Each structure stands twice: as C-alpha cells, then as structure tokens.
C-alpha cells in the first residue's frame, strides 16, 4: 500500500498545510466495494454507537452523526442475514469516562438505546449481537470478546460503521487491525466514508478531524472506501 508522505511535502506554510489536506482527500476518495463481492458467510457488519445519545438527544448528540442515519439504515437493510454487531455506549452514573466527557448514555435511559432506524423487527435467523460498552473502545467489551472468540476464524471481512470516526470507530478499528496483525491473520477491515461521522465543537472541526481519522486508519492498513455498493 502506497501512502502519502507528509514529510516529503516539507510543510512550512499555511498553503503547504492546505495542499497536504487536499492530497489526503485525493488519496482517500474514489474507492467503492460491491457488497456482492464479499462472501456473505465470512462478512460481518459492525455499527459503533448509533444510539440516541449520539444522534438525537443528549450532551453528545450531533447533527453530523444524524446525517449518516439514512446511509447506514440502507446498508443495514441490504445486509439482512449477515452477521452483525451493534455497539451500544452504556454507562452507570459513576463511569470513569465522565472524567473526560459529560454524562451520557446512562444504562436504562433512552440515550443508551439503538436508534429506531436500525432496529429490525424481522431478524429471525440473523446472527446479531448487541454489545454494551463502558469505554470508547468496543474491542475491550465483554460482549465483543465473546463474539471474536466465536467468529474469529470464520469471518474475514469486517465492515465498520458508526460514530464517532476519530474516537470510538478509530480506536476499535486500529485495535482490531493490530490484533490480527499480531496473530499474522489476513483480514479485511473496511470503513465506508458515507457511514461514519464525527461532531463539530470548539477546536474540534468535524471535517478536518474526520479526514485525519480516516487517513490514520488508511495508513494502518484499513480499507477506506466511499461506500459499499
């Protein structure tokens, strides 16, 4: 995999920075994957934290995240019958994470529930896991440990979606990739740009941070595509 070298660009001025950003955008865009090209029995969909508290209501809800709901719901529908994991950010009132973030997604409250657009009534026969997580990295959740122990040898393609790109999606993706690298296992991790998003707030510019997170994953061997066709 050939990746853009920011060192080679010799960034010194604001114009150099803008040029580097445009080169990153160019490197990431224009790739698509046909869902039909992936073996259904060896492919799984991961949806990170598409809960009410990050989409519709609460201290961490973002309209940017709400904007990907339609794309994600459509992908979820097309992947009926595939293995799926829905990560649900879920905390108690004394969560250590609240030292870094405002209280959110308290267990038993509406914020911690999966958004209605992704709830599937007709799920009989589907292998769906709903994994509650108490940290920003779903890899460490007990429910995911159970899933990976069961499916590690039979799933080769991991489609990772959800929010937010630079925190929970990034941490899970990089940890999963390094986990497989450590074991010398060939697995495809795929992140569709139209199905991940982050937030705007203060110095956290959503467009810029989203781009840097995608590029971070790209340089780590994760496939970044415009969408899953």
Where are these regions (language model features)?
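Active-site-adjacent betaalpha module
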Residues: 1-44, 92, 103-229
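A short alpha/beta connector and helix-capping loop motif
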Residues: 41, 45, 58-91
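Generic enzyme active-site microenvironment
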Residues: 46-47, 51, 87, 192
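Short acidic, Gly/Ser-rich segments with clustered Asp/Glu that frequently serve as metal-coordination loops
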Residues: 50-58
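Short glycine-enriched, charge-decorated loop/helix-capping segments at active-site entrances
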Residues: 58-65, 100-105, 134
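Active-site nucleophile/metal-coordination loop of metallo-enzymes that catalyze phosphate/sulfate
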Residues: 85-103
């Amino acid at each position: 995999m050939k990746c853009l070298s920011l060192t080679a660009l010799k960034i010194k001025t604001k114009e150099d920075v803008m040029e580097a950003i445009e080169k990153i955008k160019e490197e990431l865009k224009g790739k698509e994957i046909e869902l039909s090209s992936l073996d259904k029995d060896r492919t799984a969909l991961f949806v990170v934290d598409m809960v009410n508290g990050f989409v519709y209501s609460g201290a961490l809800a973002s309209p940017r995240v709400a904007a990907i709901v339609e794309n994600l719901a459509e992908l979820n529908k097309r992947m009926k019958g595939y293995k799926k994991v829905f990560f649900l950010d879920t905390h108690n009132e004394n969560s250590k994470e609240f030292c870094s973030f405002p209280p959110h997604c308290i267990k038993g409250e509406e914020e911690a529930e999966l958004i209605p657009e992704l709830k599937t009534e007709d799920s009989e026969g589907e292998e769906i896991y709903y994994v509650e997580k108490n940290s920003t990295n779903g890899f460490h959740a007990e429910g995911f440990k159970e899933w990976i122990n069961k499916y590690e040898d039979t799933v080769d393609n991991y489609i990772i979606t959800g929010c937010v790109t630079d925190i929970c999606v990034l941490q899970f993706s990089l940890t999963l990739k390094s986990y497989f690298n450590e074991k010398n296992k060939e697995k495809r991790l795929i992140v569709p740009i139209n199905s991940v998003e982050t937030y705007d707030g203060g110095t956290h510019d959503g467009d810029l941070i989203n781009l840097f997170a995608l590029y971070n994953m790209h340089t780590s061997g994760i496939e970044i595509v415009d969408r899953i066709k």
